[in-house]
Amino acid sequence: MEIPRLLPARGTPQGAGGGGCPAGGGGVHRAPASLACQAPTRRLLLLRGAQDGGPGPRSAEAQRASRGLGPSLNRLAPRPDHRSSGGGRGGGAGGGGGGSGGGGGGGGGGGGGGGGGGSRGGSDDFFLLLLDPVGGDVETVGTEQAGAPVRREEAGAGPRPERRQSAGPPAGRPEPGPRCLSAVPAASPLPAAGPGPAAAAAAAAAAAFAGTITIHNQDLLLRFENGVLTLTTPPLPAWEPGVAPFPQPQPPPQPGALIAPQAAAAGFPPAAAAAAAAAAAGAQLGDCPELPPDLLLAEPAEPAACPAPPEEEAEAPAAAAAQSPRGPAGPGPGPGVVLYLCPEAQCGQTFAKKHQLKVHLLTHSSSQGQRPFKCPLSGCGWTFTTSYKLKRHLQSHDKLRPFGCPVQGCGKSFTTVYNLKAHMKGHEQENSFKCEVCEESFPTQAKLSTHQRSHFEPERPYQCAFSGCKKTFITVSALFSHNRAHFREQELFACSFPGCSKQYDKACRLKIHLRSHTGERPFLCDFDGCGWNFTSMSKLLRHKRKHEDDRRFTCPVEGCGKSFTRAEHLKGHSITHLGTKPFVCPVEGCCARFSARSSLYIHSKKHLQDVGAWKSRCPVPTCNKLFTSKHSMKTHMTKRHNLSQDLLAQLEAANSLTPSSELTSPGQSDLSGAELVSLFSDVPGHGSAAVLDTALVNSGILTIDVASVNSSLAGSLPADNNSNNHSLGQAAEPRALRGAPSDLPQSLDTSLFFGTSVAGYQHSPLDMDDVSAGNVGLFGSLALKNSSLEPQALTPSNKLTVDTEALTPSSTLCENSVSELLTPAKAEWNVHPESDFFGHEEETQFGFSHPTGSHGSQKDTDLITVTGTPFLV
């Protein structure tokens, strides 16, 4: 082993007589004053240990240097602050430091001291130069072999010829006090060379004391007896050296340096403290303070992972000493605190206990795959950094939940205390989620969100009274609709319209439903410029809220402020506050989601724009809807224009669903293709298929194929007929027609149809009894009379306009082909008193003259009315 340098006792003031100390030293250790003036003695101190065997190559050199027989070792220069008051060449070399192959020199007069050691050639050479605790010269000798006999003390009565000795205390040293005598207990006296004061002093100076020092992290027992220093390995350390802070910050210790802590360390006996003080420093004159407890050899400092900045010199010793497993020997943040620094780069964490540092180091090794604790169960590959985590993991295999919640009524248990603590926070923060609307509190955010939906949705004051049903509704009409589900077993009112199988629990509801088939909308909005009409009064009242700006349904969310006229609109708006998007685009490959149905509708139009070209247009003249397929157009006509399936089949067979490329304009819609045979049926008398389908009349869609007109329609068209100058589009009052039959012509010309004038028409009588009986097929529609007019398009109308000059009692129909759509005329009059279903409303009616006799006689004509309902409103 190697002891490079022996530091003097801390606290020796600079410039004091005798041995000095480095700057910032501690207390001064001095020998008894009564022994300082005696004749110098020679003590041979042997350092004994397990590594002291073998011949020391530097033993002779050290002995010669100590005795002054050889030259001084220049490389063992004394410390700059060491001074020796004794004479001789030995005093000049006292207090020197040892090197790899150096020796040591002794000081005279107890003023200097040093040690040295080295190794060369594989053999160890150790020697120790100690200041004489009782004064006089101290001689160092290298050990030669293990177990060598302890050399006896050599005492001389006078000074040696090689050195100058002083009979009294050196100049500048104060007289020592008597209280240091108790620090060195008396023991068996050493054998003296002769009687006299020197022998008595030697006997009094003999002392035996023991202590413990740590060299290279190994505790050694130090025993100083009869001038012999002995180091042995203890079987078991009886105590751990204490750590006390220094009175002031110190620089980092040098590698291998001996550190002398404060003498007032707890747990050290006074004798051991005195022995350590005597072994650590030379005896000096003056007062004797408390002695250090032991001598600690600091390890060579390793490079610190996070070196302290220069201004933090107070923390540098602790950071450097924390690299060792023992921890820092210097002061920490507070008195008696040991800090262990993590050696990993860029970590810098410190710990108060060594095992905490070990556990922390496992976290660094775990990132490199070093997890030593593995689950022993087969099939489980979990590994952990600590045994506690493995133990906690094994509880999960055993289904053990030892940590139960202490809250009454909870009953939950957990596998770890950490999970229990996390659960307890829920009880501590119970009802911490508060609703901003009603101030009600909830334990979790999920429950709060569920509660907030009740505020976003409108109130539902109407509850079902059926037994066992607790559903609530926003409006009373929704409640009535729901109640019908409970009365389905009762007698229901079924819709008799072909293709409709809806049933209702009340006749009034069926009546409202039938209006959707007939197109009747008796409830008209009376606001100027509106023109909307509805099938029920409730829908009309709901519509009037727009004109009155009655937005009774307001969003309850703070800061929103939106209001709506209908409850369902508010309900759809409330979804936007929930953050959900329930409306998904049905187009394949499109994952767009929306919170409102209206947003989805707007989005769906973007997909329709990708279609190359529109194929079909709605055949209703006032409807400009375009469709990509006939199926979508048929669906539109059924729902929007209330056309039956039979009528749609006829239109499809007549090829009336015309592509838009053939529709030049709404006013020139070519709806030809339907034969008269398919459009007119049940003609009495002559077998001519000329009875108009009433469904086509009611719908306002009339198509006539010019090429299919091959039947002889009796009638004549005089070339000089003055009625050609008039059109059928002029309105007339039917009451006036009924009151003045003489205004009506007695012959019905071919002004029912327009076309080329043909001479030589054959006349046939017209049986008006069939017309009065309800067969209005032949005159179900009135045509333009002027043949010079361009073809006109179908126009929606709910009134019939009758031109009195165009109505003639002619019973013959022309055989020429017609090439135009027939437009119903408009007329306004009150309905018959017996018509109670439609009420007072404007309806499509057709007026026909009803001659009671033959066409040749001048008789009064009666006007019959046929009620029709157009779907285009």
Curated annotation (Swiss-Prot):
Keyword hit for ATP-binding: no
Zinc finger (C2H2-type): 340-364, 373-397, 403-427, 433-455, 462-486, 493-517, 523-547, 553-577, 583-607, 616-641
A GO molecular-function descriptor: zinc ion binding
Biased composition (Gly residues): 14-23, 85-120
Region Required for transcriptional activation: start-end pairs: 645-776
Keywords from the UniProt entry: Activator, Metal-binding, Methylation, Nucleus, Repeat, Transcription, Transcription regulation, Zinc, Zinc-finger
GO annotation (BP), single: positive regulation of DNA-templated transcription
Pfam families linked: zf-C2H2
Gene Ontology terms: cellular component: nucleus
PROSITE patterns documented for this protein: ZINC_FINGER_C2H2_1, ZINC_FINGER_C2H2_2
Location of the region described as Disordered in the Swiss-Prot/TrEMBL record: 1-23, 48-120, 138-184, 240-259, 301-330
Compartment(s): Nucleus
Subunit structure: Self-associates. Interacts with ZXDC and CIITA.
Descriptive protein name: Zinc finger X-linked protein ZXDB
The organism of origin for this protein: Mus musculus
Gene name in the database record: Zxdb
